[in-house]
Amino acid sequence: MTGSLLASKRIRKEFGSKSRVVDIPDLIGMQRTSFERFLQRNVPPEEREDIGIHLVFKSVLPIKDFTGTSSLEYVSYSFGETKHSMKECISRGMTYEIPVNITVRLVVYDVDKDAGVTSIRDIKEQEIYFGTIPLMTKRGTFIINGTERAVVSQLHRSSGVFFDHDKGKSHSSGKIIYTARIIPVRGSWIDMEIDPKDIVNIRIDRRRKFPVTILFKAFGYTNEDILSFFYKKEQIVKKDGILFKEFNPDNLKRNRASFDILDPETGEAVVKKGRLFTLRALKQLQVAGLKSIPISEEDIIGRGFATSVVHPETEEILAKAGSLIDPEVLEKIADAGITEFSILYVDTYSSDSMRKTLAVDKVTSRAEALIEIYRRLRPGNPATPEVAQDFIDHLFFKPAYYDLSNVGRLKMNHRLGMSTGIDVRTLRREDILLTAATLVELKDTQGAVDDIDHLGNRRVRAVGELLENQYRIGLVRMERAIKERMSMQEVDAMMPHDLVNPKPVSAVVREFFGTSQLSQFMDQTNPLSETTHKRRLSALGPGGLTRERAGFEVRDVHPSHYGRICPIETPEGPNIGLIVSLCTYARVNDFGFIETPYRIAKDGVVSKQITHLSAFEEKEHPIAQANAVLDDQGHLMNDLVTSRVGGEFEMVAKNDIEFMDVSPNQLVSVSASLIPFLENDDANRALMGSNMQRQAVPLIRSEAPLVGTGIEGVVARDSGVAIVAEHDGIVVDVDAKRIVVKNTENGKGSDDRTVTIYTASKFVRSNQNTCFNHRPIVKKGDAVRKGEVIADGPSTEMGELALGKNVTVAFMPWGGYNYEDSILVSERLVKEGVYTSVHVEEFEVVARDTKLGKEEITRDIPNAGEEALKDLDDSGIIRLGAEVKPGDILVGKITPKGETQLSPEEKLLRAIFGEKAGDVKDTSLRVPPGVEGVVTAAKVFSRRGLPKDDRTRLIEDLEIEKLEKDRDDEVRIITETIQERLEDILAGQALQAVVKKGKKVVVPAGTLVTRGLFEGISLTDLMGLTVEDSSLTEMAHVILEKAETQIKKARENFNNQASRYEKGDDLPPGVLKLIKINVAMKRVLSVGDKMAGRHGNKGVVSRILPVADLPYFEDGRTVDMVLNPLGVPSRMNVGQILEIHLGCAARGLGRQIDDLIYEKKTDELRARIKRIFTTPLIKTGERANKDKTHYDFSSHYTVEKSMAKRTNEEEIQFVDTIDHMDDTEFLEFASMYKNGVHMATPVFDGAAESEIKSLISYAGLDPSGQSTLYDGRTGEPFDKPITVGIMYMLKLHHLVDDKIHARSIGPYSLVTQQPLGGKAQFGGQRLGEMEVWAMEAYGAAHALQEFITVKSDDMTGRTRMYEKIVKGQNVLEPGMPESFRVLTKELQSLGLDINLLEGKK
């Protein structure tokens, strides 16, 4: 068995020197997790967290009526079961959705207005149907109206507080204007700015600005409160005519003394008059216990009062808080006999912005402030303090109207240094005060502002959150309707379901999935395109950016993207940088920030413990790269290590390193990490390479790359296109359409599921019309493990991603046919169907009930000969397997015609041939131009209640037959497994009671249980089984009960599915029958097809050469493709050359293995395979010098020596397995490598040049990787050796057959009468201005006249031309082009009298 397990899995020769510390996470886990968190479907109601749909219900409900006498309260929600399976939804054009039921409580109150008491009168609780929600499939997609759609996650600015400045561009003075913005998820935006006059202004919702202190006063703060929050105070005391201030060393630094400052103990002058206070002097005075120091009046003139100064007798305000001190005020204070007052302390580095703002602000009271703000935001509405107070409370402090979100609160706490609870999701007054304080401090210190492109300030809204927002919009719409119903009708007589109408909610959700910019038609070209589409992040969409307004900075790569967003994969064109991809190891945390994993390092030792950090958690921590040199215990070997600190690269001492990357391919996306030798390619070409892999068409026979990167298997498994075993088990039955596996996970079948039947999809059409087909890769009797691929999907082979083919490529010019990226291809590739792909087109026809009568699907079509009907069955539907070409009938349909006046001849024909022929027209579904293929499927959907035709019944019978087979197999396997299990458990026990089959005794009492005893006895008959050991009897009964439940479930499933077929279908109104026909087309590689490698090396097939003419090797093998060597140097994608060399070695080793298999030299083959796969790579730490210290394959070598040097457990296990295989198993394993040994050269940790050379030599080839080729035309060798090897080439979805198009006659535009444009409209080729010039330049006057008149928009000329051709008079008579008439009419409509003057010369 060990052998067959190894044989079912492809082993690659690994070149990576870094062992994988952490597995690549589930590639579409982000989508699934987000949706699961939104629904919390499998969480009991009482345990649900406040997220997703639960939070939406909690935040919108309870809904109270306008009088407060009743309220509708939320209790819980639950889900029903899906009505149709995913397969049915796709074929019937339905949405895969799940019904939602919500339990609500209607509470009616008695209100005693006089006593002000409210008591509950009545409570009614009810579960209500609340519409449906589309359900995510296992593959992370949604099926909406029969098509698979993916919801792209949005990357948007997170909520919270942000500080920025205008870089001095706004004001003419060039002064930098600092701004702060508080962004909530829901509610009003607050903008603060400091203008050039140092006044702090605020805007709410981008309205007119006003001083921020008005808002503070509206919050209830006085001038003194505001000043004490922003500034320190200094107490001034007047003694004996001299002013003194308290001695505070912090406030005196860098100040000068107004008088001699004396030591209180010795009396000597410590600081002389006019001198600076030094740190030493301040310390001396502090030690001496000095309490106050003398100051002059000049020291405080120009400073501000901290509190208002009031006359002690008259209570007249002599100076307001914040007003400036001048000699007059000081005189007034002295006259009033006031000896103490406090002033503001503003140091030389700070501004008094807030004092200036207070001076500008003319508002004196809270009521005045409230009314002032209300007038600014609601001009025209009458303002009272109460209304204004309520308005401001709603604006910032009510959860229903303002939501900062937990992310916003987290960011605000982080930025303002607060520790407010994360559940406080509204603003607090302190938040606005602190924001203003931080803004002033930033401006004063010229501090660093926030970088809005940093990933700490951008977060991901995944599908769950997007849906949550839509659901809330729907519920708020519904809330208004509920309030109106509560007030209009008598609540006592109502039940909750009378109030709740779920339609607005369902409509919003449906609109989101159908029309939102973020809900996209899924790219299903191949598994990689599916996976990357689900991992895509878009900055566009509602609440995001627009293409036109997005600047360069937003699109650019940022240091915080490292390990989170791929710097390579992004579309070319207007969306560049706005649509990006998640990195391989990245994940999105609960707050929506992207995290990447790191290994924890401490004191120079890197552990295997992993932590995930978001961009702002990473901040200033030194992080070593994945290629940092470690010893076996994880100690960093170099004293100085290259690391990243705050986005910059620095050399850091090893003991200071805190984290280390987990893998070299951590910083690129899935698509980019599939490119071998990515590190040797220019970034622009790498971008093209990763984008073009997504366009590769699945071929008839897929082939995994010989030179891969090692993650092909992960992509194939996670993409969901391959069938993966759900449990450990043994394959019981396999055919092309299904795999039956007996589960062995939990003992022998005692698990809840004893058998799993996997159904394979055959020639199913994908969204991009490529062919989705499963091919089982296991055999009957194979053991399979959970998570193992058991059937390949499109573009997968042996459970690995296989987008293209390994072909022999030569780099050389060939007769100019590979000029400018053209590709020369061998005829062998066409003959053997190497690049042949199957494309499936779906056509549908609808029979409707029209005003004139019912349309009919029939074989009886007027004016159609027997030849046209030969492939239609009696129901008028084409048979499966029929070959069709353009114009052929797929489904015969006739439509009633309106009554017309008949000529006498027609009346006679009617009289002879009956009524039928005349009153119907042929509206059959015919094959459109450009489609030629084989009919692979026909689906018929009939309206419920109408009789079914023969074809429909035949299709249903076949489907029910399949279901019966599945049910019978499942019951049989469960029965056999349970019988065996019972025989094992009860072995040697004597039966205490007889076992009967009906009334007949099958096993008498006292019989000892042996293997095979229960064979042929049903589980129901075994239910009364008893043995001496009561515990064993009990165990046997538990097993039998479980089995009975499984069998019952299998039968129920069959009955449910079978009954669905018998019921008929739900079709749109007026539709009687819907028929869908699938036609599969073979697309053979042809001239004009676009092909590409994985390094951005794209080109178009220019010529398909006969094999005899192609360059060939000495042994007669020809090359498959010839590429232009000039395509490499200027593009700087050298990775393709390294790939070709390594591919050359891989194919050479494969040929050696093939020869040894042919010669049956098993021992030599064993040694060679062990040598290939276990030759030690450079030990970790020698990577930097890899080129100098490589191991030579051809040197004296034994596996034992290798094992001593390498401690890789997998490798030891591999050698052990190979040694224990018998010859048959081993040859089966070895034959996997006949066509080449598969290599894995991971991104940024790949094979070194020296390793490739050594491998080429070991394969018996020239280490230069070049060979002498001979010209197929002459037989002469070419002048110089040529680089030739194996390259992985893809056929892209830009196929010439889909683009080529010809027109003779066709539709014309209504106004201009010119032919339409484009293939879809069956249009013509535009002859534009430049083409006219070209014709003129060649003097082709008559041809040109024909082009722009009779072949275009000369209507009379067109008909004349037709008549002339019919009569054989080929004379051109052009008339007036219609577009000229349109032009003259246009000018006449503008009031210009313009006419064409005709005259003869």
From Swiss-Prot:
GO biological process, one term: DNA-templated transcription
Catalytic activity from the UniProt record: RNA(n) + a ribonucleoside 5'-triphosphate = RNA(n+1) + diphosphate
Transcription keyword on record: yes
One MF annotation (Gene Ontology) recorded for this entry: ribonucleoside binding
Enzyme Commission number(s) of this protein: 2.7.7.6
Gene Ontology CC annotations of this record: DNA-directed RNA polymerase complex
Superkingdom in the source lineage: Bacteria
Alphabetized Gene3D superfamilies for the sequence: 2.40.50.100, 2.40.50.150, 3.90.1100.10, DNA-directed RNA polymerase, beta subunit, external 1 domain (2.30.150.10), DNA-directed RNA polymerase, subunit 2, domain 6 (2.40.270.10), RNA polymerase alpha subunit dimerisation domain (3.90.1800.10), RNA polymerase Rpb2, domain 2 (3.90.1110.10)
Keywords recorded for this protein, A-Z: DNA-directed RNA polymerase, Nucleotidyltransferase, Transcription, Transferase
Similarity section: Belongs to the RNA polymerase beta chain family.
Subunit structure comment from the entry: The RNAP catalytic core consists of 2 alpha, 1 beta, 1 beta' and 1 omega subunit. When a sigma factor is associated with the core the holoenzyme is formed, which can initiate transcription.
Purpose of the protein: DNA-dependent RNA polymerase catalyzes the transcription of DNA into RNA using the four ribonucleoside triphosphates as substrates.
Name used for this protein in its record: DNA-directed RNA polymerase subunit beta
Species of provenance: Desulforapulum autotrophicum (strain ATCC 43914 / DSM 3382 / VKM B-1955 / HRM2)
Source lineage: Bacteria, Pseudomonadati, Thermodesulfobacteriota, Desulfobacteria, Desulfobacterales
